[in-house]
Amino acid sequence: MEDNKTTIINRLEAVKRNSGKSCSQIAEQTGLTNVYVAQLLRRQAQLNPDTAPSLRAALPELPEDLLQEMMRPPMRSYDPNLIQEPCVYRLNEAVMHFGESIKEIINEEFGDGIMSAIDFYCSVDKVKGVDGKDRVVVTFDGKYLPYTEQKSEHMVSRPRPH
């Protein structure tokens, strides 16, 4: 399966490369976030059939077989060696370094819970800092999910005495 996924990703990346467009440009044309476009092209997200026409318009060379493949649920996986890529390593390092503080603020602002990575939006933007130098802005926008008290009376899967 992994060889097939790699082949599909390589073909999708070739379509993008041949278009001459960036993920941000494709995102602008499709109404998606730039990270979601990249996720689609790396088979880490499923293409919604309603979005397929705008993606096809943004990438006219996208063949029908790849478009159909993109609408199937993907195998969301990654190469464990990916962490060795410096940009990915630094992103992981930033999350790990700031993670406890972010968790503390989430708990203070929302209560005991987490940020969903399912009902989730992510984007990467380029801005100028106060010093005039380029800065990277990574936005994680996830639904808040509170932890629940596990009362047996609310557990519908548990058999009830009649």
From Swiss-Prot:
The active site is at R90, E93, S116. Pfam families: Cyanate_lyase. Keywords: Lyase. It catalyses: cyanate + hydrogencarbonate + 3 H(+) = NH4(+) + 2 CO2. Its EC number is 4.2.1.104. InterPro entries: Cyanase, Cyanate_lyase_C, Cyanate_lyase_C_sf, Lambda_DNA-bd_dom_sf. SUPFAM superfamilies: Cyanase C-terminal domain, lambda repressor-like DNA-binding domains. This is Cyanate hydratase. It comes from Populus trichocarpa (Western balsam poplar). The lineage of its organism: Eukaryota, Viridiplantae, Streptophyta, Embryophyta, Tracheophyta.
